[in-house]
Design a protein with these regions (language model features):
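Carbohydrate-binding surfaces of carbohydrate-active enzymes
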Residues: 205-208, 252, 272, 283-286, ...
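Polysaccharide-binding and catalytic clefts of secreted carbohydrate-active enzymes
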Residues: 110-277, 281-302
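The substrate-binding groove and active-site-proximal loops of carbohydrate-active enzymes
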Residues: 18-30, 53-68, 115-134, 159-163, ...
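Aromatic-lined substrate-binding rim segments of carbohydrate-active enzymes
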Residues: 35-42, 49-114, 141, 242-249, ...
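Short, well-ordered coil/turn segments that N-cap beta-strands
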Residues: 15-17, 44-46, 78-84, 146-151, ...
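Short, acidic/polar
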Residues: 28-42, 135, 139, 260-271, ...
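Conserved, mostly hydrophobic/aromatic
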Residues: 21, 40, 48, 77, ...
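N-terminal carbohydrate-binding accessory modules
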Residues: 1-49, 60, 75, 400
Length: 710
């Protein structure tokens, strides 16, 4: 494993701002290639990405390699000044491989093997598949080692996006080996998984089964946690096989992966440390359809800020350019001006390179209506013009943009694999830590406050406030880091339930939130309970159990009536999701108290001075109303202020900076013109360095990058 330091403040180290497209020369007649290269060069593109789904072309039968198609395509592009990023094609193994080795196919939770085709149909835990993956990677690396136009590599494609889990025999065998290596003795595994509950103990590692849910009832949370740890380990190992080969063949190549669904990947482990930087594929209008936040600009900012928390700045290997679809879903079509605005938003949130998906749409297959820069009729319209404008701007501004990090005044604890998985193993209808954090992120986004995600092991010194959203798994060394941050003047906010489970996913045996956190916060949890979500009829909408899902009647339960209310400042509001009854130390200030039922007058939220700062504890989950009240109380004393005050609706503001410069990105994500007041003095780098003093006029989907004076 690399000793690379992972930090949200890292920048991408490349010799240019990479700008271009994923390109599929195998999808179009060769008579188009020269014209394609000419138009890419005219657009200002300097790189393409190729071959991630082309294993069947590169190796049409076992041991017989044919690189001719890609050699010719790379050569034509190179003559026009366009370099190539090659991809290991292991997301789509060829049919001859699965026909010869059907045991490498993934198996779902019902025991059904995946059919050949589509993508990610093979099991990355399979030793047989791993050997073939290494073989094709080595063959490609050796072939392209001396090609001057091949500058870097992408591993696989969106690992674990289609189907992260597998219940194959290969996965079972590898899982058993993983556990034997971790625990050494079966008695230690039984203790970690709570084998004395429901007769789940094992006599040997060979007896261990995969955690198929509802077989007939729920598996142990410890069992589930280790299974997903194994999946993350297996994914990182599969990628490491490839990275090791690429590094050995040509150390000067950069290597990255294009993240998609973010499932079963430990971003603070070997997976990210093996890479020069991460890539993240961003389809704002698609992700908004999944999340239904009602605003694709907010969704884009959220996803990119989460990604940046893994290891810092990134590149975008696939940026939505047009209408996107597969047979079962589709997206909105970006209006004229939106392609460039979305691309600039990616840069504003940390992209140090960007490729528009894709050069031209396919005329066949399961993505025929996933549009690209060029249309089906081979004509480049407004998307080509906008991509050209963006490429020209990034080439001109690369020395300003590269080397800057994204400012973050409010940090949200993120990028911790164990905590997201621990929630999934025992959710009891509660929002995940990330879902809870979305409320704070959206609040900051709407008000132009610099906000992002960062791990407590990272450098917190640039922050002013740090929020921990209900991380049930906690390490005492993190407590020491939070204490040091507060002592130096920072504000720490810790959500309910934090620190209540061990690394084995057991409930702790001390009074919550655990000895170290209790000392830091001055708080002890005496009792707790679930509450209905705001507006809900009960504690859950769907009950999962053996035999399927049970949907309760659409009528109020007792939990709908049994509300917990609290007062904070001069406001009174209803708590959502969860409550805790707290006792406190003498040096702790109560900043919110329960105001009804038996807990009336008892602390709900507290603050304890630590050095120059404070540590706040919340005995509930965030709601929109609580988020507003809490930030009004905490932000100003912490020194948290908007980058631009009084933002009109539809305007996004972010800042990239370093010791030499500050770049304020101001974007209008609405289709109507808007006036933004309160902009700090500087020069708009997208408008001929025009001087900006206080006021900025933006057309619909208009953007500015203001290099702030002083």
């Amino acid at each position: 494993m690399s000793d690379k330091t992972l930090s949200a403040w890292n920048t991408v180290k490349t010799d240019r701002f990479l700008v271009g497209v994923p390109h599929y020369p195998e999808h179009v007649d060769e008579s188009y290639w020269e014209r394609d290269a000419e138009r890419m060069a005219k657009a200002g593109f300097n790189v393409v990405r190729m071959a991630e789904f082309a294993w069947h072309i590169l190796e049409p039968k076992l041991g017989t390699y044919d690189f001719d198609l890609f050699d010719r395509a790379i050569s034509i592009l190179g003559r026009h000044g366009i370099d190539t990023i090659m991809c290991t094609p292991t997301a789509t193994p060829p049919r001859w491989l699965t026909a010869a080795h059907p045991e490498i196919l993934r198996v779902d939770g019902k025991g059904r093997p995946m059919s050949h085709g589509s993508r990610q149909h093979c099991d990355t835990a399979s030793p047989v598949f791993r050997e073939h993956s290494k073989r094709i990677t080595w063959a490609m690396a050796e072939h392209y080692r001396d090609n001057p136009f091949v500058v870097g590599w992408q591993t696989d494609n969106e690992l674990n996006t289609s189907m992260p889990e597998s219940f194959s025999q290969a996965t079972l065998s590898e899982f058993q080996a993983f556990l034997a290596d971790k625990y050494r003795e079966i008695s230690k595994l039984n203790a970690a998984w709570g084998g004395d509950f429901w007769a789940t103990a094992y006599d040997s590692f060979e007896q261990v089964v995969l955690p198929i849910e509802f077989g007939p009832t729920f598996p142990s949370p410890g069992h589930l946690q280790d299974y997903h740890r194994f999946l993350a380990f297996s994914t990182a190992r599969f990628q490491h096989d490839q990275v090791e080969i690429l590094r050995d063949v040509k150390p000067s190549w950069f290597v990255f992966h294009n993240l998609g669904g973010l499932r079963d990947i430990d971003f603070r482990g070997q997976f990210s440390k093996d890479l020069d930087f991460v890539g993240y594929d961003i389809y704002p209008m698609l992700y908004d359809e999944f999340m239904r936040l009602g605003n694709h600009a907010k969704v884009q900012a959220l996803h990119l800020d989460i990604c940046r928390g893994f290891s810092g700045n990134y590149i975008v290997p696939e940026q939505q350019s047009g209408f996107g679809s597969q047979p079962g879903f589709c997206t909105l079509t970006p209006e004229p001006g939106e392609l460039r605005r979305m691309a600039l938003s990616s840069v504003a949130h940390g992209a140090d390179g960007l490729m528009f998906f894709r050069w031209r749409p396919a005329h066949f297959g399961a993505e025929i209506y996933w549009m690209g820069i060029i249309d089906h009729d081979d004509i480049g319209r407004h998307r080509y013009e906008e991509a050209t404008r963006f490429a020209t701007e990034m080439t001109a501004l690369k020395d300003k943009i590269l080397g800057t990090y994204v400012r973050m005044d409010v940090g949200i604890a993120g990028s911790d694999f164990d905590n997201q998985e621990a929630h999934k193993t025992y959710p009891i209808g509660l929002p995940s830590p990330q879902d809870d954090a979305i409320l704070l992120h959206q609040y900051c986004y709407d008000r132009g406050i610099a906000c992002g995600f960062i791990h407590p092991e990272d450098d917190l010194s640039k922050l002013k406030l740090f929020y921990v959203p209900h991380w049930v798994m906690w390490k005492d060394e993190w407590t020491a880091r939070l204490e040091a941050f507060a002592a130096s003047g920072g504000t720490v906010v810790i959500g309910a339930r934090t620190g209540t489970r061990t690394q084995d996913n057991h409930v702790i045996r001390e009074t919550a939130p655990g000895t170290a956190l209790s000392r830091l916060t001055g708080v002890r949890v005496e009792d707790f309970g679930r509450l209905a979500a705001p507006g809900a009829n009960g504690l859950f909408d769907v009950m999962e159990r053996s035999g399927g899902l049970v949907i309760p009647p659409n009528k109020p339960a007792e939990s709908h009536r049994r509300q917990r209310r609290f007062k904070i400042g001069n406001r009174e509001m209803t708590a959502g999701h969860f409550y805790e009854n707290l006792t406190i130390d003498p040096d702790v200030e109560v900043i919110a108290a329960w105001s009804n039922r038996y807990a009336e007058g008892q602390p709900m939220a507290t603050s304890r001075k630590v050095g120059k700062g404070q540590v706040v504890y919340l005995g509930t989950y965030l709601t929109p109303e609580l988020t507003e009240a809490l930030t009004e109380r905490l932000f100003a004393p912490a020194g948290v202020e908007p980058l631009v005050g009084g933002l009109p609706e539809g305007v996004e503001v972010t800042m990239r900076m370093n010791d030499e410069r500050r770049l304020l990105f101001v974007q209008n994500y609405m289709d109507q013109a808007v006036t933004v007041d309160g902009v700090p003095a500087g020069r708009d780098l997208l408008d001929g360095e025009k001087m900006v003093v206080g006021r900025l006029e933006l057309e619909g989907y208009g953007c500015a990058i203001v290099e702030v004076e002083g």
